[in-house]
Amino acid sequence: MAFLEVNNICKSFNETEVLKGVSFEMERGEVFSIIGSSGNGKTTLLRCLNFLEIPDSGSITVDGEVIFPATDDQKKKVCPKKRLTFGMVFQNFNLFPQYTALKNVTLAMDVQSENELKAQGVKFLARRAAMKEAHAKNEETAKELLTRVGLENKMYNYPCQLSGGQQQRVAIARALALSPDILCFDEPTSALDPELTGEVLKVIKQLRDEGRTMIIVTHEMEFARNVSDKIIFMADGVIEEMGTPDEIFNAPKSEKTKTFFQKSNEEVKA
């Protein structure tokens, strides 16, 4: 059994079918890149995996546990803990502007600690004392993560004091803070100036080298080729073609895939 099994995921918005039965499997430690033209369901697929959108049908299984069975009751009651299976890095950073880089990373862990204490039935005063200890540990973890992404000298800066590349690295540290099984990136460099793209891609490559399981929606074709175990090409809400980077980039079988690369090459030359 594969580590992640996505089976026949469908999603519509009003009358528009965005995902039309998407299925794939991946093993722990693999990196998949999802490519394709805009408007073909790539971001919606990531949002469904993270339960930011609830699929209309299909199933998602992680490490043998079905975390999304498509029954009517369970579609409406996705356990928040299941969301922690996936971490999400958004293209527009989504940092809290009123908080420092350190607090942006610490905050999610503090919320998780608070929820765990409440679930254990810890009373208010005891919970307050326990949260002081938890916050101290969470802050140390946040400092370690920010150091890992090269921001040890920017921990107390606010987002407005950081470059786009630095903000995205804070967002990556925040996603790692909750120790997700699978880390998802939605076009992590699309909002960056070209000169800042490299610093973010370097961090993602470092995570790959550490054995992180990752799904990356990207328009960076050369990066996808170099960092990925498998490439998924999506078109019209389905997986049109899937294979190794060599298979997809050097010997695509689908006419839609071939056309996509032809247009991409023309845009690069232009």
Language-model features: locations:
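ABC family nucleotide-binding domain
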Residues: 2-4, 10-245
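C-terminal boundary and immediately downstream tail of ABC-type ATPase nucleotide-binding domains
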Residues: 235, 242, 246-270
